[in-house]
């Protein structure tokens, strides 16, 4: 698992390789990742937008931006946690993801929180640092 805290918001990510959806012979590798966001602060916040930077094993970069996560813009009161699962395909057997969530404080001010960088490794390649 990978974890990072920004402004009392903790983001934890756990990636999973999806062998049943991957086709290594066709250079198609798929991962799911489970994200848990915990508000450890004293103010209510809302997740407004996501921004992912996905890099494959040969350095090709794809950026993904959009409102919310999995169709939701969750509100997290102090002590609340929100979890979701999503996924990404790559044309290489490994890669890395990192990103940010744009949050809004209860007073309407926006700020970014970090999504920790995490490695996407398939069993079809020896693990390495990306």
From Swiss-Prot:
Domain ApaG, first and last residues per copy: 3-127
PROSITE patterns: APAG
Pfam families: DUF525
One BP term from GO: error-free translesion synthesis
Source domain of life: Bacteria
Xref: InterPro entries: ApaG_domain, ApaG_sf, Uncharacterised_ApaG
Name of the protein described by the UniProt record: Protein ApaG
Organism: Paramagnetospirillum magneticum (strain ATCC 700264 / AMB-1)
Lineage start: Bacteria, Pseudomonadati, Pseudomonadota, Alphaproteobacteria, Rhodospirillales
């Amino acid at each position: 698992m990978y974890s990072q805290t920004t402004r009392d918001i903790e983001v934890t990510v756990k990636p999973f390789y999806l062998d049943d959806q991957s086709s290594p012979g066709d250079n198609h590798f798929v991962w799911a990742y489970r994200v848990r966001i915990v508000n450890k602060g004293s103010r209510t916040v809302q997740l407004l937008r996501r921004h992912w930077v996905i890099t494959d094993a040969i350095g090709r970069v794809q950026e993904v931006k959009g409102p919310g996560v999995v169709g939701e813009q969750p509100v997290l009161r102090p002590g609340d946690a929100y979890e979701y699962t999503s996924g990404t395909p790559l044309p290489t057997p490994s890669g890395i993801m990192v990103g940010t969530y744009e949050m809004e404080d209860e007073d309407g001010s926006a700020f970014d929180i970090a999504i920790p960088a995490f490695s996407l490794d398939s069993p079809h390649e020896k693990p390495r640092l990306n």
